[in-house]
Amino acid sequence: MAQNAPDCEDTQDFQFKLHHKIVAFKKCGEPRSNVNLLAVSSSRGLLFAGSPTQPELKVIIVKDLVNAKSTAQQPQARLVPLPSIPNYIACSSDGNLLAVNHTQNGTSLLSIYAVLSFMTPDVRPVYNIRLAAEDHVHGVQLLWNPVLPNSLAVVLSNGALAMYALKEGGNFEMHSLDKNQQVKCGCWSPKGKQIVLGFPGGTVKQFKPDLTLAKTLLCPPNIHDAPFDTIAIQWLSTFQFAVIFLQHGEDCSPSLYILNAPKAGAPSYINYYDICYSMNGPRNHQFVFSHVPQWNLLLVVSANGVEVGIMRSTEAGDTPAWQQLTLLDEARIEMPLSEDKDETFPLGFAFDTSTTHQLTINEKKLQTMPMVHVLSSDGELLSFNFLNVLPTAVSVCSPPPPVADTSGQFKPLNMLLASEEEEQPAWAASPSKAPAATPAASSDISFAFTPNTVTSTPAPSKDKQPSLFSGFGAAAAKAPAPQLSFGTAPTSSPVSFGAPTTNAAKPTTPFGGFGTQATTTAMGSMFSASGANAFGGMALNKPAIASVTPRTAAPGSTVPATPASAPANKPLYTVPLTFTPVDTKPATSAPPQIADESLKPDDTEPIIKDMIALQIEAFSKDIQKQKEQTKELLKGIAAPSALRAYAKRLDDLQELNEQAKDVEFELDVQGLRQGLNEAYAIVAECRGKLEIYRKPEITRLMNSSSCDPSGRRMLARLQSYVAANEAQLRLAQQHVDLQWEQFQDVVRRNSKSRMHMPCLEGIYQRLTRLQNLTSNQRIVQNNIKSKLKERGLLQAALLDQEKSRTRTNEAVDTLTDSILTMSLSQVVDSNAAKLTRERLQKIRNIVQLQKINVICPQRPDRVGLKSEVILETKRRAEQIKRAAAKPATANKYTQAAVAPPSPPDVAPTPAVAPMPQATVTVAPPLPKPMPSIPSVVEKPGVPTHPTTPVATPFSFSQSIPFVKTSTVTPTTNTVTPGEAAKPGLSIFGGSTISSFSFGGGAAKSALSFGTGSPAVAAPTPKPNPLSAVEKPTPEPTKPKEQKAAESKEFKAVQPETEESKVPQKPKAETENKSFGFGGFTGTGGTVGNTSSSPFSFGGLGSSLGFGGTAAAVPKSEPSSTATTSVATSASTAPFGIFSAALAKPSNSEPITTVTSNTTTITSKPTNVIASSSVTDAPSVTTTNAVTSSTDPIGGLFSSVTICKPNTPADTTKPANIFGGGLSAGSFSFGGTIDASKGLFGSTKPVATAPTSVTEANNKTDPISTTPSAISTTTATTTVSSPAVVPAAVTAAVPATSSTTVTSSTAVPGSAFSFSNAFSTLSAGGAAAPTTSASAPLAAKSPTATSTGNNSSNSVFGGGFAVATSTAAPVASPFQSAAKSPVSSANIFGSIPKAETSVFGGATTAPSNTTAAATPDAPPAGLFASAAISNPSPFGSPTTRAPASGGNIFGQAVKPSVFGQPAQAGDSGGSIFGGGSASTPFGSSSIFGGGNTQGAVGAPAAGSTSIFGQKVFGQSSAAAPAAGGNIFSNPVGSPQASPFGGGGNSIFGSPATAPPASGGSIFGGGSSSGGFGSFTQTTPAQGGFGGGFGQGGGGSVAQTGFGSPQAPQQQTTTPGGFGAKPVFGGSPAFGASPTFGGGATFGSPKGFGGFGGASPVASPPPFGAAAKPAQGNIFETLGGQESGLSFGNLAQTGNSNAQKPAFGGSSFMNYR
C-alpha cells in the first residue's frame, strides 16, 4: 500500500507575486492538449512563446518584460515565423539551443535553433530532424540533458523514444526505443548520466544515454488502481522520483507519488494525490515538473489545473520527505479568468533565473529572485516574482551577458499584436480581446488606491479614495487584481473620463461605475458600452488612437496621466502622456504614427463620434439624476435655523455616545480585570491542589494557603536541604555499596584461599584421639594378656569364667526375662556404668587438654590495627604533615626542575625531582629471606625495624602498606601457621586493606593508581643523608662531578650520627592522594609526598600514580643496624604504572638488609644519578638474621605487605594460594610479595651467601658499589635527570663486606604486579649495584653474581635492571633501561633486553654485560615463565629445557598440580590448551589436554582439553614458534607500533629476536608470554618508547606496559609495572622455594610473576614465556586469518604473524 502524504503546511516563506501580465497572443481558440509553448533561455535572457493557433514564435527579451512596468514601455519582442503550428518548445540546459516540435503535413519535425541566431536578421534551424516515420505523431516531451547541452531525448505520442546526440555541422547520432515499449514520459537524472522513463502500469526504468537498461522499478499492484499510466516523472535525487499516475477511463483524477527506491530494499510510494487540483477537462491530463534543487522545491503544473502546486523538502539524505505547501491567497500562481469569465489553463511554464531586479518588501530589500512565466490558454503571458523570504535562501539567479540585437526586428509587443489584428478582418467581433496596449496596460501588483490627482510625478498610493465626482478627467491607476478599489480595474489601468483606454482583462464590480471597466462585455455598468472603457475610451487595436482625448471631456481632463502602479513595495509612478486636441496628431513615437496611417481614419471616425455621443448622453442623464436626488433631500429641510437644532442634537448624541462608550469601556475593563484575578486564583488553587496531590505529606504539616512568603522560602530552603541530603545519602549508600562489594570480593577471595574446616572436624579429631587412646590401651592390654599367657595365669581365670557361665538353668531363664525387658538405654547405662566417674572425668580432661588443630594459612590479624608499627606510622604521618609546612630547599630545586621538560633523550618525564612524591621509593624488592646460613651473626636477634608503608587501597603498585615486622631467626623464616592466614588473605594476594589504588600505596588515597605510599623505611640508626630531603644538595646528588676515573665510589655524605632526615612527609601526604597515574608527584625530596592533583596520568603532581611506589622512608634508629637510606632518584621507581612493590627487606642474610632502601633524591634534573643509595653501612655487622621488616605476605596481585606478626624464618609454607603478599593492599597489582606466601608468591631469595660485615661503624664513605651479599634491597636509584648516564649505586655495603653474594634472590614479585610504570628501578634482591658503565661515575661492581637480580622493568620506562656485574647504566624511569642482568618479565611483559625507556634517553650500551643475551633466561611474567623445577600448582614443571618458560596458559614443563608432566623443555602445557604429556592427573590437564609437545595447544596425541580443542590455545608444534601472550603479538621482527617505535603492539614494539614470539598488547612481544613480557635480542622500538626518544644502547624494545628487559644477564629482574620484583621478581614469586624446591612455584623465579624467569629451564611462572611456541589465547584468536571459531582455535599455529597493533590480540587483529 502506498503511504499517505504528510499534511499540508501553511507557509509564507515562499510567495509568487504577479509582476506583469501582458497579452502575447490573441484568439488562442480552444485550449490544445499535450503542448508546452513556453521556454526560457536564462543564460541569454530570452523568452520564447509559441503561438497556440498560428505558425509563429515570439521571442521576448526578459529584461524588457521586467522593466515594462516601471518604464511604461512595451517589452521588445520579435515574431519568428515557423513552418507550422508548434507543439512543444524547449531550451537546452545551457540556453544556447531551442528545440521546436511542429507537425508539417502530418509529419512530425524537430527544428533546433541556435538561440543567439534570434538576435540576427536571419533565423534558420541548425538541425531539422524527422521524429517518426509515420504521420500524425508529435512530441509529447522534449528532454534536454541537464549537463550535456547537445543531448536531447524526445518522447513521442506513439510511445517511442528517440535519443539524439547533436554533432557539429548539423549531424546527429540517434538511439531509440520502439513504440512497442510504450514510453509515456521521461526525465534525466540530476547529473545527466541516466534517463528514467515511465511506462504503463507504473513501471519505471532507468536507462543509460545509449538506452541500455540500468534498473527497473516495478510498481506493486496495490499502489494505484489499475490500469493506469505514468504520465509524468521527475528524477529528484539518486534514489527518489516524483511520478504521476493516471488511471484509464473518464473522470479519473491523477495522483502524485514520491517514489523512494533505495539501493537495497523494496521501493516505497507516498501518495500526495493531485496537488494542482486539476479538473477532468477540457484537455488531456498533462503535468510539467520544475525542480529547484537549491531551495528543495518542486513546482507542479497541470494542464487542467488553475493553480501551480508546490512541494518542499526540509530533510537531507537519499530519500527526504516532501510536504505540500499552501501559500497565502495573494501569493499563489492562479490562472486568471478570461474576459468571458471562463477558466484559463497553462499552455506553457518556464522557470527563469536570468532576472536582475530586486524587490523590496516591508522596507527590506530582498536578493535577486527568479521569475516564473506562465502562458495562459487565452494568450496572456503572466510573469511572477518567485520569492523565497527564508533567511537561509541561496541565490539561484545569474545575470545573462548583454545580448546585442543585430536583427533590427525587435518591436514593442503591442505593435506585433496590432499587426496581427490587421490580418484579422473581423476584429470587431471580439473587441474585448483586443487589449489596448497603452503604456500602463496592466499593472497587477499595485496595492494602492487610485490617486485622486492628475500629476506627472510619482503619486503615493496612500491617498484617500476619490470622492464620487472627483474622478472626472483623472487617470485611475489600476489596483491589484484581488482588490476592489474604487475607480480602478483590477487587471488593467482603467481610463477615467479622458484617459486612454486600457484592456479589460479581469473585470471587477465597479463602485458606482465611475471610471471603471464594464463588468460584462455588454452593457454592464452605467456608462460602459460593450466592453469599452467608460467615458470616452473604446477598445481599440490601434495604439495611436488610445491617446486621443474626446473633446467633450471635462476641461480638466485634457492632460490626463495614467499612473502605472509599481510592484507592491514601490511608489506609484504616474507616467504622463502628453495629449493634444483630437484634431492634432498625438506627439507619439514613429511606430504609432505608422499605425495611424495603416488604419483608415474614415472608417473609425464615425464610430468614435457615435460612441462619444452615447457616453455624453449617459453622463448627462446621470447628472440629472444626481440633481434630482439633491433636490429631494433639500425639501426635507425647512430653514437654516432648523439645521442648528439638528446639529445640536447631533452633538449631544455624539457626546452621549462617547460617554456611553467610556462607561461601557470602564465596565468592560473592570469585568475583565476581575475575571483575570479570578483566573489567577483558579490557577493558583489548581497548582496548590496539584502540589498536594503530588506531595500529600506536606498537607499534614500545614495548610498550603497558610504559608506566607517567608514560610515558603524557608520551606523551599528546607526542601533544598532535604534534596541535598538525599543526594549525599545516595552517594554515601553507593560508596558503602561499593565498599561492601569490594569487601565481599575480598571475603570471597579469602574464603577461597582459606581452608574451611568442616563443622564436625573437632568431633572427628577428638574421636580419633580417643580411638588412638583406646587402641593404645588395647595394645597395652594385649601385652598384659600375652604376658599373663606366658605365665599361665590367664588360663585359670578363663576357666573360672567358664564355670561361672555354666550355671543352672535358672540363670538361663532369668536371662530370657531380661532380654524381653531389656532396652537400649539400659545397655548404654550398663556400659557407662563400667566406667567410674573418676575415669570419665579423666577422659574428659585428657580430651579437653588436646586442642583441636586447625590447619590453615594464617594472616596477620588486622582487627583493631593496634600494631605498634601502624601507630608509629600514624605518628610519622602527623610529623610529616607538620614538616610539610616548612618548605625544604629541596622543594625549590624540584620545582625548578619541574618546569623544563626534560630533553627528549632523557625522556619527557619531568625532572624526577619535581614530583611531590619525588621520593618514589623504589621499594627495593627485598628478597624474601631464604633460610641462609648465618655467618658471623653478631646480634642474631636484631629485628629489622619495620618499614611502615601506608596501606594502599587496591594498589597496583608496590606500596606495602604495612610492613610487617618479623623477628628474624637467622636461618629460617618459617611462617608459623598462626601467621599464615590472617584475615585478609585474598586469593590473589594479600589482604586488601584498602581501597583500590593502582599505584603506590597512597595510604588513604582513594583509588590511587600509582602513588607510592611511602613505606617508611625501617628505622636505620644513621640514615644516610642521601635521602636528604632536607638537604637538597647532598654531594651524591651531583654525581656527575665525580670523575669516573677518580673514584668509582659514591661518597655518601653521611654524618654517622645524624639520623637520616628522610622526610616522613611522604606518608602523610600520600594518604590523601587522589587517583594519580604516575606517582610523579614529588615536591621536593619528600619521600612520599604526593601532591594531591587529582587523576593525572603521570603529570607532575599527579595523584593518580599508576606506579608510584610507596616511598619507603627509612626510619632512622640509633641502633647500629645497617641503615640504608637509599636515595632513589626522586621520581624514579615509584612511577611504575602499577608501581613497583615496596622494598621488602630480605630476611635471608645475616647481613642486615635495610628494608626499603629508597634513597629519595630530589636531585635537580641535571644530576646524572641521584646519589647512590648509600646505605650508611656503618654498622654492617648486622645481626645475621635481619627479619625483613617488610616481609610482605606475597599476594598474587600485590606486593603490598601488611603488618604481619613476626614471621619465623621458616619460609616454606606458602600462605596464599596465589601467594604474593598483598597483605595489606587489597588487590594491588604491584607490591612486593612475600615470597613465602602464596601459590604464586614470590620465591624467597635463594639463600644468599651470608656475608657478615663485621665492622659496626664501618663508614664506607666511598660507598663502593660492590653488591654486598647483603640482601639489602638494592635500591637502585634512578635519576630521571636529563643526564643520560645515571649510575645507580645500589646498596652500598661497607667495603669490608664480602661480596660473595650468589643469591639469586628473587625480588618479591607479585603475581600481577606491574612494575612501576615509569620507574624501572628494581633492586635485585642481592644488592647488585648496577653501575652505569658509561657514567663517569662508573662504580665498580664487585663480583657478586647475584643471579637472582631482578630488574624490574617499568611499563613506560626502561626496565631498571640491577645488573650485577653488568655495568649497564641504570636508566631513569624514563630513560632507557639499563640492561637488566636477568630478563624480568612483566605481567604485561617486559622485553628482556636493554632498552631505552619509553620516554627516556637511551642508556648507553652496557659496557660490561657479561653474557650475551642468552635466551636462557626467559623472563618470567604473570603468565610467563614458571620458576625452576619445583612443581608449581599452575606452572608446568620443567624438566630440563633451560629456556622454556611455562605459562599459565602455556607450555608446561614439569608436573604441576594442574598439569602436564614436564617434557621437553620446549613444550609448555597450558592451563587452557594442550598441555605436555603425562600429568599427575592423567595426561590431560585440568584445563587442557596434556600435550606432549605443543606449546599452547598443540594437540598432543590423546590429550584432550576440558574446553575442547584448546579453546584458547593454538596448537603449535614444539617448534620455537611464537609464544603468544594474551595481549601479545608475536615477536619476530620489530613491527611498527602506533605510538612510536617499531613494535606493532599497540603500545610497544615486539621483541624481535627470540624465536618464540610473544607479543604483548602493550608491548613488543617476546617469547615470554604472560601479559606481555617479551624478550628480544634486537632492539625493537617501544610503543611509548621509541616514540619518545629512546636511544640507548640502540637496543631497546620498549613496551607499552611491559618493562623491557635485557636478556643478556642470566639474572632476571622482575618488574612488571613497578620495578620491584613485582610480579615475579625472584623473591616475590619466584625466589625462595616456597613450595618446596627452590622456587615457589617452580623455578626460583617461580611464579616469578613478572620477574624474570630463572635462567634455569623453568616453566615460565606466571609470566614470561619461553622460546617454544606458545600461542596465547587471545593472540591466536586474533591471529586467525579465517576468523574466530572454536574450530580454528586450536588448529592454527601462531602463524608467525606480525599482527597489527594490539598485537594480534583477539578481534582479528583489528583488521
Swiss-Prot record:
Q: Where is it mostly found?
A: nucleus
- UniProt keyword annotation of Repeat present: yes
* Name by which UniProt lists this protein: Nuclear pore complex protein Nup214
> Per its database record, what is this protein's job?
Part of the nuclear pore complex. Serves as a docking site in the receptor-mediated import of substrates across the nuclear pore complex including emb, RanGAP and phosphorylated Mad. Protects mbo/Nup88 from proteasomal degradation at the nuclear pore. Together with mbo/Nup88, sequesters emb in the cytoplasm and thereby attenuates nuclear export signal (NES)-mediated nuclear export. Together with mbo/Nup88, required for the nuclear import of the Rel family transcription factors dorsal (dl) and Dorsal-related immunity factor (Dif) and the activation of an immune response.
Any one GO MF term held by the record is: structural constituent of nuclear pore
Q: Where are the sequence repeats?
A: 472-473, 486-487, 497-498, 511-512, 514-515, 535-536, 588-589, 598-599, 1009-1010, 1075-1076, 1077-1078, 1097-1098, 1106-1107, 1135-1136, 1218-1219, 1229-1230, 1240-1241, 1356-1357, 1388-1389, 1399-1400, 1434-1435, 1449-1450, 1458-1459, 1472-1473, 1481-1482, 1487-1488, 1507-1508, 1512-1513, 1539-1540, 1547-1548, 1562-1563, 1571-1572, 1584-1585, 1588-1589, 1601-1602, 1617-1618, 1623-1624, 1629-1630, 1635-1636, 1641-1642, 1647-1648, 1650-1651, 1662-1663, 1686-1687, 1702-1703
- Region entry Leucine-zipper 1: which residue ranges? 650-672
Under the subunit heading, UniProt states: Component of the nuclear pore complex. Interacts with mbo/Nup88 and (via C-terminus) with emb to attenuate emb-mediated protein export.
Q: Which organism is it from?
A: Drosophila melanogaster
**Bias regions of kind Basic and acidic residues — which residues?**
1037-1051, 1058-1072
Q: Please provide, in alphabetical order, the Gene Ontology terms of the cellular component aspect for this entry.
A: nuclear envelope; nuclear membrane; nuclear pore
| Compositionally biased residues, Gly residues | 1560-1572, 1582-1595
Where composition is biased (Polar residues), the residues are: 1251-1261, 1688-1698
Membrane disposition: Peripheral membrane protein
User: Pfam families, alphabetically?
Assistant: Beta-prop_NUP159_NUP214
Q: Where is this region: Interaction with emb?
A: 1044-1711
Q: Which UniProt keywords apply?
A: Membrane, mRNA transport, Nuclear pore complex, Nucleus, Protein transport, Repeat, Translocation, Transport
Q: What is known of its domains?
A: Contains FG repeats. FG repeats are interaction sites for karyopherins (importins, exportins) and form probably an affinity gradient, guiding the transport proteins unidirectionally with their cargo through the NPC. FG repeat regions are highly flexible and lack ordered secondary structure. The overall conservation of FG repeats regarding exact sequence, spacing, and repeat unit length is limited. FG-rich region is required for emb localization to the nuclear pore complex.
Which stretches are tagged as biased composition: Low complexity?
A: 1596-1614
What is the annotated localization of this protein?
Nucleus, Nuclear pore complex; Nucleus membrane
Chain's gene name: Nup214
Cite the residue spans of the region called 45 X 2 AA repeats of F-G.
472-1703
The ranges of region (Disordered) come to: 886-905, 1012-1081, 1251-1270, 1533-1552, 1557-1614, 1688-1711
Gene Ontology biological process? mRNA transport; negative regulation of protein export from nucleus; positive regulation of RNA export from nucleus; protein import into nucleus; protein localization to nuclear pore; RNA export from nucleus
Region spans: Leucine-zipper 2 = 767-788
